């Protein structure tokens, strides 16, 4: 089976497990990008602990769920946003989050993967990867 977008598959697995009220989910294959996105989600309080499991192939990630995710997904195409766009939240960016203060956008910047709030504090832009609320 060919996996074209591992981040989209990981986000779909998390949302499906949350909808079924599962206590944990196993994401495979693992990647550094998925681990960095999970780290941001953990810092923001959407998921619990996660651990890498080496299976000798691609690896897996076990994620403990807290039941706080209503919706999550990737943003396709992954387009760039400037710092000023993050502050103003134009209509095309507002469609991913239900409200200004609810949810996070996950952004890949030159300083690493972070939430849009952290990018605003650091005054940097980047490439939109995903949204969670």
UniProtKB/Swiss-Prot annotation:
The gene is rps8. Part of the 30S ribosomal subunit. GO terms for cellular component: ribonucleoprotein complex; ribosome. This is Small ribosomal subunit protein uS8. GO terms for molecular function: rRNA binding; structural constituent of ribosome. One of the primary rRNA binding proteins, it binds directly to 16S rRNA central domain where it helps coordinate assembly of the platform of the 30S subunit. The keyword Transmembrane does not apply. Coiled coil: none annotated. One of its GO terms (biological process) is translation. Pfam families: Ribosomal_S8. NCBIfam families: PRK04034.1 (NF003115). Keywords: Ribonucleoprotein, Ribosomal protein, RNA-binding, rRNA-binding.
